[in-house]
């Protein structure tokens, strides 16, 4: 049995350089991953298809239903209150008007934890939202205008809930 905290990111990703060509999108079909925090409790993982535990996670990804999605596994030892953080590459958006972060997420399980989304710019970590608890068995679209920064990366910090269900 496991509880899943899921995320399908659309307008981001790739590593090794500063991204300055937009829109920048990824549906994880090319197995492009994000940068994992080496000091937290574990890594986000790629998954295809349904989760193996009843009443947790989606039946498939948002885009095709058969594609890949990024998620946190919270079966033992992934609970309680374990932190999993992943980062996008640095984005240089100084010449880009109308900066926006958008993605699809799925948080289904009775003991679901939290997903914190933050901007890191100039060494400052600024949370922009926290989504908490069981959101039901469906995908949701998140949309955040990004203001007052020209260079940044995004942190996705998942904190597992009180159990794996």
Where are these regions (language model features)?
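Bacterial Sec-dependent N-terminal signal peptides
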Residues: 1-22
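Short, intrinsically disordered, charge-balanced linker/junction segments flanking boundaries
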Residues: 15, 64, 161-165
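Extracellular glycan-recognition surfaces and repeat-rich motifs
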Residues: 18-77
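Extracellular beta-strand-rich recognition modules
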Residues: 28, 86-107, 115, 150-160
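Extracellular acidic, Ser/Thr/Pro-rich low-complexity tracts
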Residues: 61, 107-109
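Extracellular beta-rich ligand/substrate-recognition surface
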Residues: 71-84, 132-136
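Terminal, low-complexity interaction segments
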Residues: 110, 124-165
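Short, surface-exposed beta-strand/strand-loop-strand elements in extracellular ectodomains
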Residues: 114-122
């Amino acid at each position: 049995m496991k509880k899943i905290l899921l995320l399908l990111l659309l307008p981001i990703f790739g590593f090794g350089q500063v991204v300055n060509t937009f829109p920048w999108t990824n549906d994880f079909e090319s197995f492009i991953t994000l940068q994992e925090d080496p000091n937290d409790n574990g890594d986000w993982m790629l998954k295809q298809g349904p989760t193996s535990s009843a009443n947790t996670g989606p039946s498939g990804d948002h885009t095709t239903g058969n594609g890949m999605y990024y998620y946190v596994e919270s079966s033992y030892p992934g609970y309680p209150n374990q932190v999993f953080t992943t980062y996008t590459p640095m984005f240089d958006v100084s010449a880009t008007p109308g900066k926006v972060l958008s993605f699809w997420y799925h948080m289904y399980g009775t003991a679901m934890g939290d997903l914190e989304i933050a901007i890191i710019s100039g060494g400052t970590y600024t949370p922009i939202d926290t989504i908490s608890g069981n959101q039901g068995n469906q995908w949701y679209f998140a949309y955040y205008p990004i203001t007052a920064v020209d260079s940044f990366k995004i942190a996705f910090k998942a904190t597992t809930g009180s159990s794996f269900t």
